């Protein structure tokens, strides 16, 4: 199925996302340009650092006592006084943008038609520019670890390529020899900001710590540009392409990220040198690259399918916006929309989560803002779970690996959070996580900030995957995560009039009214009780399956 869209897409939200799990881009079409909003899944502000929470076991105990008396107003205020002094997590940042601007002498582009081929993970575009019919393909290859933008034209056109970004600092350009002016390489390098010391409640243009106190990771990107039928000249860090009938732009990023608990590389030139040295070895055969990309993608995409109405072949064009605007009684409208959304959901996860990448975050892998909504972090009170619900039912076992890895990395900070904040053993993770695996509460109201069940709920995803794949080696790999999450949950249980339950408790981002006052902290909540009940059921199931548990683990269940 190929989703098609008529007209330009000047807004990021209207663009076409694509990615290979590690890198991603959104392709937007302006009146005279294509813009690639580029992302690398490891580009975050900050670095590993020690941090403590204002929330303590003593404060939680006071709130528990108040809530047990039915004094939910006091319980909320006790927790609120601490959570409003918390810090927020770090921010997922954009790499920058690559702009391919077409000459305006021929006028604006006309008859623009855009497409997303869900069966091949291929973004497409066609338009008329003067006398030229122009076609664009764009994809991001996992096998070659390259993002590709390919333009072909029926007549010579002029275009320019430029790269910009808030955190980019320097550019290096090398062009072909005088006898070969059809190739150029552009290497950009930048520096992520240091710690975000601001908060979502009070967003400013400069929430960063002073650079004298700390800077973030370095990063670099290499662009290889080749043209057909014309030449490239360099003017002020812009690659001018004159009289070309073909243009091939390839991109690879490299960040200074070394691991969630390791200080990153902060020297831009080290990364630029390392990345620049790889360009000569990049593959040159675009057709072979595309074939490898499609074959790699389809080994995931072809595992399942849904048919609710008439069959759609891979090349069938579905005018998506037109169908959305059509009347409800249009034949097969709902069937087509449902099939498209099923395929699009799988496409997004295949494109944003691969083995050994970072997990798919709040916006997958795509972000164009320096201060994205909710920092585009890992929101564990619903969003990251939703991203991965499909791995089992859609036979995408490999794609859950980043979520498993992240939860393994969260165990140490989760142990610290459980002990220092809640006075419990095991591992507790609050609702916002970043690449540095921050497990502490976020800044703000208890309705979101006081919810230490992020890892416990992610365990549902991890165990659900086992129920589909029945792989005992996989189950053994997630056992320590489930075990330590369960230890925390068991320690946090209290006797209530309805039996054992986590107390005090919230239900994520939910309020209730007592005596005319809107509050968030109750003695118990069905949300947290259900998560604990489910985790303990899953733990017992896992323990009955795994043959080699040690005595301590056997005693737990």
Language-model features, listed with the residues they occupy:
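Buried hydrophobic packing segments
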Residues: 390-391, 459-465, 535-539
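Acidic/histidine-rich catalytic neighborhood
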Residues: 484, 488-542
């Amino acid at each position: 199925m190929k989703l098609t869209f008529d007209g330009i897409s000047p807004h990021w939200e209207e663009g076409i996302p694509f990615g290979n799990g590690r890198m991603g881009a959104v392709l937007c079409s302006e009146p005279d340009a294509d813009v690639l909003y580029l992302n690398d899944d490891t580009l975050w502000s900050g670095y590993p650092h020690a941090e403590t929470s204002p929330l303590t076991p003593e404060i939680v105990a006071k709130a528990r006592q108040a809530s047990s008396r039915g004094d939910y107003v006091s319980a909320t205020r006790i927790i609120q006084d601490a959570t409003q002094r918390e810090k927020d997590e770090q921010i997922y940042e954009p790499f920058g943008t690559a702009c391919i601007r077409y000459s305006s002498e021929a006028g604006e582009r006309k008859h623009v038609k855009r497409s997303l081929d869900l069966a091949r993970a291929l973004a497409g575009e066609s338009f008329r520019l003067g006398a030229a019919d122009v076609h664009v393909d764009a994809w991001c290859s996992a096998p070659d670890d390259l993002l590709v933008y390919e333009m072909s034209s029926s007549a010579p056109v002029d275009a320019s390529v430029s790269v910009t970004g808030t955190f980019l600092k320097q550019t290096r350009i090398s062009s072909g020899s005088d006898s070969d002016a059809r190739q150029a390489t552009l290497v950009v390098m930048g520096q992520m900001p240091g710690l975000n010391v601001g908060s979502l409640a009070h967003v400013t243009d400069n929430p960063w710590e002073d650079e004298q106190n700390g800077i973030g990771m370095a990063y670099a990107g290499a662009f290889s540009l080749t043209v057909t039928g014309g030449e490239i000249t360099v003017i002020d860090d812009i690659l001018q392409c004159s009289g070309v009938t073909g243009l091939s732009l390839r991109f690879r990023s490299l960040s200074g990220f070394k691991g969630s608990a390791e200080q990153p590389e902060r020297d831009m030139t080290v990364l630029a040198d390392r990345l620049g040295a790889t360009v000569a070895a990049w593959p040159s055969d675009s057709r072979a690259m595309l074939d490898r990309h499609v074959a790699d993608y389809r080994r995931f995409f072809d595992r399942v399918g849904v048919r609710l109405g008439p069959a759609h072949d891979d090349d069938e064009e579905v005018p998506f916006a037109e169908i959305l605007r059509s009347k409800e009684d249009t034949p097969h409208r709902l069937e087509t929309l449902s099939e498209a959304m099923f395929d699009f959901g799988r496409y997004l996860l295949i494109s944003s989560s691969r083995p050994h990448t970072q997990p798919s975050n709040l916006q997958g892998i795509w972000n164009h803002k320096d201060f994205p909504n909710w920092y585009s972090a890992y929101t564990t009170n619903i969003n990251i779970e939703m991203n991965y619900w499909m791995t089992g039912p859609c036979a995408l076992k490999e794609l859950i690996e980043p979520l498993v890895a992240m939860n393994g990395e969260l165990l140490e900070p989760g142990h610290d959070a459980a002990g220092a904040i809640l006075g419990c053993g095991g591992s507790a993770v609050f609702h916002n996580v970043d690449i540095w695996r921050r497990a502490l509460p976020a800044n703000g109201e208890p309705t979101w900030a006081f919810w230490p069940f992020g890892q416990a709920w992610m365990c549902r995803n991890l165990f659900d995957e086992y129920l589909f794949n029945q792989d005992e080696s996989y189950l053994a790999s997630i056992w320590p995560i489930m075990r330590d999450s369960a230890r925390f949950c068991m320690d946090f249980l209290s006797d209530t009039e309805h039996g054992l339950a986590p107390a005090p408790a919230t239900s994520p981002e939910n309020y209730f009214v007592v005596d005319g006052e809107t509050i968030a902290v109750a003695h118990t909540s069905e949300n947290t009780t259900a998560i604990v009940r489910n985790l303990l059921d899953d733990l017992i199931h896992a323990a009955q399956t795994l043959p080699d548990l040690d005595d301590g683990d056997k005693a737990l269940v």
